Amino acid sequence: MISTVLRRSILGTSRRTLAASVTSINAALFHNLAPAAATVSDLANGATNVKSLPSNSSPFGVKVRDFHVKSVPSEFRSSIVSSAGFAAQEYAPSYENDGGIGDSESVGSSGGGDGLAIADLGISPEIVKALKGRGIEKLFPIQKAVLEPAMEGRDMIGRARTGTGKTLAFGIPIIDKIIKFNAKHGRGKNPQCLVLAPTRELARQVEKEFRESAPSLDTICLYGGTPIGQQMRELNYGIDVAVGTPGRIIDLMKRGALNLSEVQFVVLDEADQMLQVGFAEDVEIILQKLPAKRQSMMFSATMPSWIRSLTKKYLNNPLTIDLVGDSDQKLADGITMYSIAADSYGRASIIGPLVKEHGKGGKCIVFTQTKRDADRLAFGLAKSYKCEALHGDISQAQRERTLAGFRDGNFSILVATDVAARGLDVPNVDLVIHYELPNNTETFVHRTGRTGRAGKKGSAILIHGQDQTRAVKMIEKEVGSRFNELPSIAVERGSASMFEGVGARSGGSFGGGRSGGGGYGSYGSSSGRSGGGSYGGYGGSSGRSGGGGGSYGGSGGSSSRYSGGSDRSSGFGSFGSGGSSGGFGSDRSSQSSGRSSFGGFGSNDGKRSY
């Protein structure tokens, strides 16, 4: 009857909200009547030792939902955590390990031993069933290393490679504790778990992992580029797990839409990337607003000083788990690395042959340095392949459609900038191609980590200039893996016409190039007569060319012979030739328009620089 009344009176309410309200009232009526009746009976008989009801209780037990008649959406959850105890401690099973768990554990890349059966973990049957439906019945040993101390309620900091499956490892204990907590105390309105991620893509991936592993929990993904009003309404209905980027989290906190006072679990995923993308201050603001009594977990591929500072300030006697060990290898074991030399004018034309030979007919991601290169390369490849571009100038809605199409196999090649390198939720990527040298080793690792995930095989190919062999060796040393050098692919110069202007620079980071700014991470320059490069420069020119096309509508900056940047000219770009928009290169031309605009860290031997 209650269900019928609710359906008739709240027709505008969402199906999820209606179901939640019916469940809550039924739970209150049928599970709490007996204790309430016993209490009333004892009081009538004059008993004096009867335990008083909690302050937020009714004769039917603890309140589960509050119904408010006002213009905003109905609040179907009430705050009950403060009177219910602490889930992280209440449901922490005691794992017995020989010698106990110390302050530090190290797990190699393979972990050793067989996988841990999920059914043997003693977790909620709902989780076991959901994971089995996804084909997940065992955890890798590397995941077990995270899961067991997480189940104990320990704070931890984990050093993990990309693609190790750590999301599931820390997610299972959290959702299991929340499910058991809700079953005993009822569901509160405010989130019990907060996960911070540096990118939208990673946030969406983590939220999806939580949602699919525990369908009964309400999860939300909070990031910019989407209507904030819709997110505020969802938060008002009640949320168990909130996953998001720090910027949007703070925005919602300032608006009073997100209350973190009941958070019992906080996770910082890819914490080192938070620092790189400028979220360091936001992260600390959020951590300061959380309850002191909580379980905190932090995962990072590297341990810069900022991460160590966070650990001391916000984690309680954390267990350090090293999922990499003493090995210098930073990539998963299943990834095979290749390198191939190519001139700037022919670089785009060898993508097709590489995909045919190494792509195995599956998914391939090509990473470029700039949005302009991504667009132009995707346009050229689309003449022969099903291909799309993904970068920061594309709207969030279009990005999601593009990623969905790539996941579903509607097209096989995705050309992307580094906006997609972290947390890209695309399973079964067989091949990653680095269109040019990345800015640093970390970028290389996270690009390459899109393949070979969760124990699967994959390949990564690095395209480099003839004069960048030293840079390739430096990457090998930093990553701890060796490249297999592929034979050069002959390309007729006429066949490169459809890619004219794409990737004209041959520089990139790690130096290289006769005039380029030299050392590791310095965005070295191209050599000979080739020009400065498009949209962001990444190298200056040497020789007689004025640098070819600069950014924003330039011709791409290939050598004057192919792209129109005539000798002693400043090319076609709007910012000049020496590596525009932060070019970090050098320019030896006496007539060029000068060194990098926007403060490029290069040298300039010209006599007329500006």
From Swiss-Prot:
It holds the Pfam family Helicase_C. Residues 558-572, 586-596 have a biased composition (Low complexity). SMART domains: DEXDc (SM00487), HELICc (SM00490). Residues 542-610 are annotated as: Disordered. Its EC number is 3.6.4.13. Transmembrane segments: none annotated. ATP binds at A160, R161, T162, G163, T164, G165, K166, T167. InterPro entries: DEAD/DEAH_box_helicase_dom (IPR011545), DEAD_box_RNA_helicase (IPR050079), Helicase_ATP-bd (IPR014001), Helicase_C-like (IPR001650), P-loop_NTPase (IPR027417), RNA_helicase_DEAD_Q_motif (IPR014014). Residues 350-494 form the Helicase C-terminal domain. This is DEAD-box ATP-dependent RNA helicase 9, mitochondrial. It comes from Arabidopsis thaliana.
